[in-house]
């Protein structure tokens, strides 16, 4: 399988979720199934069927997280050489030359991306346009909303 780039923080969040699902959620669902079984006829037992459905969702998510972690290429940005170039995991401050607004973006893996928190996927048009560039470079990025011109103001490796 293809390796998935992921920050240390992203891998830690997935491990936390996996621990919660295995240590808290799964045992609770098993208990709910056992309680529902005690109510008799399983054919018309809505509690039983709901708990079994939750069990399916939980087990599916556990498998999904385990697969992602087994294929993850965890990249610790703090151990990367600081050469001033935009790379995976870097935090980039840019100036949108169309609107004169400054914006900070952190380039992360697909599963970590959250545009509202300025975490952009390494596969997003903005990240693809910025990767490999340096401070003071001006880049034109083709986004779904049209072309945007950015000047790179700073690159941090935190």
UniProtKB/Swiss-Prot annotation:
The protein's GO terms of the molecular function aspect are: DNA binding; RNA polymerase binding
Record keywords, A-Z = DNA-binding, Transcription, Transcription regulation
Query: What superkingdom does the record give?
Result: Bacteria
SUPFAM superfamilies membership: FKBP-like, GreA transcript cleavage protein, N-terminal domain
What the entry lists under Gene3D superfamilies is as follows: Transcription elongation factor, GreA/GreB, C-terminal domain, Transcription elongation factor, GreA/GreB, N-terminal domain
What GO biological process terms does the UniProt entry carry, in alphabetical order?
DNA-templated transcription elongation; regulation of DNA-templated transcription elongation
Its annotated function is as follows: Necessary for efficient RNA polymerase transcription elongation past template-encoded arresting sites. The arresting sites in DNA have the property of trapping a certain fraction of elongating RNA polymerases that pass through, resulting in locked ternary complexes. Cleavage of the nascent transcript by cleavage factors such as GreA or GreB allows the resumption of elongation from the new 3'terminus. GreA releases sequences of 2 to 3 nucleotides.
Which family does the UniProt entry place this protein in?
A: Belongs to the GreA/GreB family.
NCBIfam families cross-referenced by the UniProt entry = greA, PRK00226.1-2, PRK00226.1-4, PRK00226.1-5
| Designated name of the protein | Transcription elongation factor GreA
Source organism (scientific name): Yersinia pestis
């Amino acid at each position: 399988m293809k390796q998935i780039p992921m920050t240390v923080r992203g891998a830690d969040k997935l491990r936390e979720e996996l621990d919660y699902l295995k240590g808290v959620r799964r045992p609770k669902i098993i208990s709910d199934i056992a309680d529902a079984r005690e109510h008799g006829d399983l054919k018309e037992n809505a509690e039983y069927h709901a708990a079994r459905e939750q069990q399916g969702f939980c087990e599916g998510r556990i498998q999904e997280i385990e697969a992602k972690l087994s294929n993850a290429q965890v990249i610790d940005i703090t151990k990367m050489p600081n050469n001033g170039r935009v790379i995976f995991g870097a935090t980039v401050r840019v100036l949108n030359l169309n609107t004169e607004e400054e914006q900070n973006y952190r380039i992360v893996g697909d599963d970590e991306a959250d545009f509202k928190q300025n975490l952009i996927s390494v596969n997003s048009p903005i990240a693809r346009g910025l990767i490999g560039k340096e401070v003071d470079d001006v880049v034109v990025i083709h986004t779904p909303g049209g072309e945007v011109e950015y000047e790179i103001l700073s690159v941090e490796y935190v």
